[in-house]
Amino acid sequence: LSATPGLILAAPSSGSGKTTIALGLMRALARRGVRVAAAKAGPDYIDPGFHRVATGRACLNLDPWAMQAQTRAGLASELGCDADLIVCEGVMGLFDGIDAAGTGSSATLAAETGWPVLLAVDAKGLAASFGPLVAGFAAADPAVRIAGAIANRTGGTRHVELLRQALARRCPDMQFLGGIGRDQALALPERHLGLVPAGETPDLERVVERAADACTAALDLDAILRLARPTRLGAAPPARLLAPLGQHIAVASDAAFAFAYPAQLAAWRRQGAEVSFFSPLADQKPAVGADAVFLPGGYPELHVGKIASASCFVAALRAFAGFVYGECGGYMVLGDGLVDADGTRHAMLGLLPVETTFAKRKLHLGYRKVRLRADLPFGRAGMSFRGHEFHYSAILAENRPERLFDPCDAAGHTLESCGARRGNVAGSYIHLIDQDGP
């Protein structure tokens, strides 16, 4: 067993304030000298950026559906290195997964790791009902231990005391860890894919500090530390995730291309690849000597004019002789053109015969299992991978591309073949996470 104890901060539903509480708790404990390692359940790219600000170290995703069990075990071991406590923020509601049984949920991760759950409840409009609500969650799955409850957006000391009493009546053995008051100054700005990324959030350090002040004043931090438990996951080798795209991988990294998993970049380095970074928005070229380019997802639709006019970047990618791979936003930039929210078309790299549009917004969301249709640097034809899709843009036109993947959704329903490949260039809307397990 890993000696480093951990906790999962979860909630009954999205929008309960768990990200803000997670940031405040991480920073409040760090102030006390606790070396906090942050994790995020599920595939989200944005929350880990906030966690990094709060803790000063990279946050790792632990995905109960898209990662193999040995991958999660390896990442949990990595989290425990040089840390006193692992705090994992859950995803959506505690039991929300890919189906009615909650497969792939934060509860799945809690049962697998043995980490106790702190349930953060939006208590605005609740009093005596707080007790039955928490009791219902606590009784839902004997493999998931809800060790304590936090009330968020409380209305004052009398309200907090009512909530404490309500929990004691229904769950006498569960700890009430405190009530955090309503504070609009703790709100984090949002956009179409969720929270505005950490690097673009003004005054983020002030918000984290204010959240830490609120947690320090309202929560029993000593009790929270006592509730943490080591993981049940056994020792595991470092996570491999996806094979390297090349010997030297140049990764686009800026506000338009921000969605690359730190664990994947670290895994590439462990497997012997060099990883360098460049900014298309700054009109930079991939590093000299790179034999592969990775254009990750992000927000190219918000910077499309600047990308189109980045002449050095565009010329370098069009002339690049190595392997070029794009995911989601990176896939859009590899195409012939991108139509922005105002309906204006911008010429893109023209490396794949695809036109995309952000003017006709439609949500595409869900886990995907895909089978590779051709040999590529990260896999042989027929290999399967797991990942996820989350975007509002859409394919406007295609010119008979060679397809990259045969996909199905998390329930196993077959979907239309997707992505495109041409020569040394390939991409799709799907963010790959791990090889498919046995």
Residue spans for each PLM region:
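Residues that mark the start of a beta-strand
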Residues: 6, 33-37, 246-248, 274, ...
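Cysteine-nucleophile active-site neighborhood
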Residues: 300-376
